[in-house]
Design a protein with these regions (language model features):
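Catalytic domains of riboflavin
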Residues: 1-198
Length: 198
């Protein structure tokens, strides 16, 4: 169950481990079940109830018990532009559809029990008349259609090398401010020297 950081805080979900050593860094929280209205928690209907209780806008920590049979995953702020994972893709797709920013994600398995990979998934989608997209497609869409850098302000600065424009930009994905010192007018048709300081 992919959830935002805000939703994990709302539900008081702690990370499953203090130090995540998995290769993909998937941010598992402690597992959950509904506090009321289920039996063992393992049936499809019990899991569905747990998911619906967890994503409810008014959900409280007391609506859930831990551990359980649903494994919430905390998405990175910034979505697939900060971490190209299934968790973030689920949240980003829900936001693009103007839905609650949460998503149930699953792995599709082949008949032989192995995990379906891209070619298998393309065949599965065709067989069942499903649309399919990749995380790379989503990253491309977001880079093309969403603004990730915002200009905050501009001022002039006098230095021993002359007058410069000092412009502040904010990276809205990582919430970092970057400063640009610009001298003179930059023409779109001409290349200019750029130096980056870290």
């Amino acid at each position: 169950l992919a959830l935002t950081n805000d939703k994990c805080e709302q539900l008081n979900l702690e990370m499953m481990v203090k130090e995540n050593t998995t290769s993909h860094g998937t941010a598992f929280t402690t597992s959950i079940d509904s506090a009321r209205g289920i039996t063992t928690g393992i049936s499809a209907s019990d899991r569905s109830k747990t998911i619906l209780d967890a994503v409810n806008k008014k959900a409280k920590p007391s609506d859930l018990v831990q551990p359980g049979h649903i494994f919430p995953l905390k998405a990175s702020e910034g979505g697939v532009l900060s971490r190209a994972g299934h968790t973030e893709a689920g949240i980003d797709l829900a936001k693009l559809a103007d839905l609650d920013p949460s998503a149930v994600i699953v792995e599709i398995m082949n008949e032989d029990g192995t995990m379906a990979r891209k070619e298998d998934l393309l065949n599965f989608a065709q067989k069942h008349s499903l649309k399919i997209g990749t995380i790379a497609d989503l990253i491309h869409y977001k880079n093309t259609n969403e603004k990730s850098v915002e200009r905050l302000g501009k001022t002039s600065v006098e230095t021993k090398f002359g007058k410069f424009d000092l412009i502040a930009y904010e990276d809205t994905i990582f919430n970092q401010t970057h400063l640009v010192l610009k001298k003179g007018k930059i023409e779109k048709q001409t290349s200019c020297l750029v130096r980056v300081q870290t």
